[in-house]
Each structure stands twice: as structure tokens, then as C-alpha cells.
């Protein structure tokens, strides 16, 4: 690590036991950027706890965020699943602390894949081993590390802004991202991606403010027509190249 980078690290995490902190920091994945801003902030809190040596805090934090996420998804999308057989199991809940019910619901509603389900099941196991008394020795460091890897993976699978996200057209127009049309009616996408998205046409522009914020501007008129993603990409590329 370069000297200035090390200085920034120690400013953030402190100089006491900095070598051990640095080793822990290197050993875990960095928090992904989520379309839900609070997820990124909470993952950073979990990371800080782990790096500082607060292993139990980091592990329980990872488990709590996992529970928070399946509650957010179920409670905000359930009205779209009134006709689904699983709706009867969750429609009265103000919150859900039954992990099996939460995970089963996400799987039944096709919100999570088999791989994400496996991560959730394993995080549930870690939660039970952590929260409920175990009359045995527990090595919290590998448990906390695994918990962080699992919750980072869950957030990445569901909310990450990146090329692996099937909901997003990633840089088909260089440097730009768009929600794919085929997913616009998916309840999960409508609830969690739409609030972070802006409806634009292919002639929109992006302006930078003095405070380094970006403003999307689009006062253009467009034909009242429905176009495909491929056609939008073609029009946008042509417009951007002028």
C-alpha cells in the first residue's frame, strides 16, 4: 500500500493495531454499490466493525441486514402477488422474523435464484449459531468473514449496479446504464430500481453542477411510439456520436 493510501486507511480505522486491521480489511470483499442506498451504508458499517475487531458485531450485523432485506422485498411487493398461493402466508405480517418463510417467499416469487437462496440458507445457519446459545467454542473470525461474504453476495445478486445485473443494460451505450425493457413490469424492479432511475429519451443530456452533481436534462419531444432496447441503443449511439 502506498504511503498516502496507508495514511487514509489509518485515518479511517485508527493507528492502534493497524497491521491487524489492515489484514482483516484485505481479507473481505468490499461493499457493493446497491440501488438501495442504505444497503451500501450498512455494509460499510459491518465492514468497519470487522476491521476494528468487532467480530460479533460484524456477524450479527450481516445477519440483521439479511433479515431486513427479505422483509423490505416481501412487504413492498406482496400486493403484486395477491393471486399467488404463498401470499396467504405473508399478507398479515408487519414484519417477518421467520427466515424459512422469508426465503421460501422470495424463491416462490422468483425474486432470488438457486444460488442466492443457498447464500441465504447459509446465512440463516450462521444467524442461528450466533444468536442462539451454543454450548461450544466458536471461532468468530471465520464466521464473521463468511457472514460478510454471504451478505455482500446477496446484495450483489439482488441490487448491485454492475455488468452482472440482468436487469441493467450495462454500457451497451458507452458509459451509460439503462433498465432493460423486459423487466419494467417486474414488481421487484418497480419497487427497488425505479426510485433510482429516470425516464429519458435518446436525446437526453447530462450536465455537471459546480458541486460535482450530475443533472439529467431531457426537454425533447419524441414520437408516441414504443421502441425496443436495441433500437434505443442504436438511436442513442447515433445521437451521442454527433
What feature does the model see in each segment?
Residues 42-45, 61, 126, 150:
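Short, hydrophobic/aromatic alpha-helical segments in well-folded domains
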Residues 69-121, 125-129, 165-166:
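Flexible secondary-structure boundary motifs
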Residues 46-47, 51-75:
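Short, hydrophobic, well-ordered secondary-structure elements
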Residues 182-242:
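Intrinsic low-complexity, glycine/proline- and repeat-rich
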Residues 4, 13, 34-37, 94, ...:
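Alpha-helix boundary/N-cap detector
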Residues 33, 110-183, 203-217, 222:
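Charge-enriched, short contiguous segments at helix-coil
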